[in-house]
From Swiss-Prot:
It comes from Arabidopsis thaliana. The lineage of its organism: Eukaryota, Viridiplantae, Streptophyta, Embryophyta, Tracheophyta. Probably acts as a transcriptional activator. Binds to the GCC-box pathogenesis-related promoter element. May be involved in the regulation of gene expression by stress factors and by components of stress signal transduction pathways. The keyword Transcription applies. It comes from the Eukaryota. Its main location: nucleus. This is Ethylene-responsive transcription factor ERF104. Residues 37-87, 162-203 are annotated as: Disordered.
Length: 241
């Protein structure tokens, strides 16, 4: 069905073709202009504009996303746990958290020698390495081959056996020193007794003790000397020139 505007346009064309154009324009000017305007508006070319949204070109879209460079802290905790859980040769962990070091002596049918208790497994492993190197030399399998230090004092077998013994207190002297001190004290007591026996008792000075020195006539004392005479052999004449 034709719309009202189309019907008016057809009517206008038929009147324009069949009737006089001038008379129509003069008789109905408003109708003519309205119909003409409607006709041009309907039949005129239409411009269609495609409005596409412009992409927002921002700096964030041009740059690639940066990688996440955050270092996780769990790596350090894992390494510490691995060191604690690592099993060292000759080391056993106690239920209360300490680490005990032991070694088997091949010279005594494989009997165990207790090397001590340590706070960490690394210290216990190093104690085992020193004892193993002393017993087996270069053939020993060690936990830390580069950390072993051999000295002249620890190379002897007595040092290895002494590792299992507990350290003596610094305040208590050894038994040998005690025995030496006892001997010295006995010798000093013997020498003091002999000196006391050899020393004569000292007589106190009294008037009676001086009578021997001054009693010349009795012939007892230091002044009991016979008188000198020219005929006596002790007499000598000194000639003075």
């Amino acid at each position: 069905m034709a719309t009202k505007q189309e019907a008016l346009a057809i009517d206008f064309i038929s009147q324009h073709l069949l009737t006089d154009f001038v008379s129509m324009e003069t008789d109905h000017p408003s109708l003519f202009t309205n119909q003409l305007h409607n006709f041009h508006s309907e039949t005129g070319p239409r411009t269609i504009t495609n409005q596409s949204p412009k992409p927002n070109s921002t700096l964030n879209q041009r740059k690639p996303p940066l990688p996440n460079l955050s270092v996780s802290r769990t790596v350090s905790t894992k390494t510490e746990k691995e060191e604690e859980e690592r099993h060292y040769r000759g080391v056993r962990r106690r239920p209360w958290g300490k680490y005990a070091a032991e070694i088997r002596d091949p010279n005594k049918k494989g009997c165990r020698i207790w090397l001590g208790t340590y706070d960490t497994a690394v210290e216990a492993g190093r104690a085992y390495d020193q004892a193993a190197f002393q017993l087996r030399g270069r053939k020993a399998i060690l936990n830390f081959p580069l950390d072993v230090r051999v000295t002249s004092e620890t190379c002897s077998g007595e040092g290895v056996i002494g590792l299992g013994k507990r350290k003596r207190d610094k305040g208590s002297p050894p038994e040998e020193e005690k025995a030496a001190r006892v001997k010295v004290e006995e010798e000093e007591s013997n020498t003091s007794e002999t000196t006391e026996a050899e020393v004569e008792p000292v007589v106190p000075l009294t008037p009676s003790s001086w009578m021997g020195f001054w009693d010349v006539g009795a012939g007892d004392g230091i002044f009991s000397i016979p008188p000198l005479s020219p005929t006596s052999p002790n007499f000598s004449v000194i000639s003075v020139t």
